[in-house]
Amino acid sequence: MAAKFIILLALFALSQASVVRRDAPLANFLQDLEKRAADIQKTFSEQFQAISNSKNVQDVNKAVKESSDVVLKQLSTLSSSLQSALTDANGKAKEALEQTRQNLEKTAEELRRAHPDVEKQANQLRDKLQAAVQSTLQETQKLAKEVAANMEQTNEKLAPKIKEAFEDFVKQAEAVQKKVHDAATKQ
């Protein structure tokens, strides 16, 4: 019962974290992005801890494997978006984008290596999946801070690309959370 309450609370927090002001200026957008990434990271972590005690081990393992496929695909998309944003960036923003892209590729590679033997390594894969999402959110936060700190050097085309890539990743992370949660609470 307590686990279900925690999951409901986490889902509520996630839904509140998903609210974005569309008319916010660039600086506010970057601050909101940082805050949202931190909220999603916390919620994601709480949900993964709550489902680790699930009695539906097979369903959870299957959901984790399928979710890791989705996260890998989204990490590749996010990395590609950052690569295209590099063409519009300059100075420190370009360095931050390149660093973020490299770190995301490293995270994706670690998740790929943990992926094949899901049944044998379900807990390890679950940990890698959680780490991949958290790492991506942390990289996004670092990127937002760097871009905000170098606002005068940042091209106006760059912020919408970062925002779009982040929004796409958040949608996938939320779908992963829901899928794993549904598998864990299946009766």
From Swiss-Prot:
UniProt-recorded name of the protein: Apolipophorin-3
Described function: Assists in the loading of diacylglycerol, generated from triacylglycerol stores in the fat body through the action of adipokinetic hormone, into lipophorin, the hemolymph lipoprotein. It increases the lipid carrying capacity of lipophorin by covering the expanding hydrophobic surface resulting from diacylglycerol uptake. It thus plays a critical role in the transport of lipids during flight in several species of insects.
Main location: secreted
Organism: Hyphantria cunea
Cited InterPro entries: ApoLp-III
Record's keyword terms, sorted: Cleavage on pair of basic residues, Lipid transport, Secreted, Signal, Transport
GO biological process, one term: lipid transport
Pfam families: ApoLp-III
Places the protein is found: Secreted
Tissues where this protein is expressed: Hemolymph.
Assembly and interaction partners: Equilibrium between a soluble monomer and a bound lipoprotein form. Apolipophorin-3 associates with lipophorin during lipid loading until each particle contains 9 or 14 molecules of apolipophorin-3.
Source organism phylogeny: Eukaryota, Metazoa, Ecdysozoa, Arthropoda, Hexapoda
Signal sequence range: 1-17
Molecular function per GO: lipid binding
Residues making up the propeptide: 18-22
Similarity comment text for this entry: Belongs to the insect apolipophorin-3 family.
Keyword Secreted in annotation: yes
A GO cellular-component term linked to this record: extracellular region
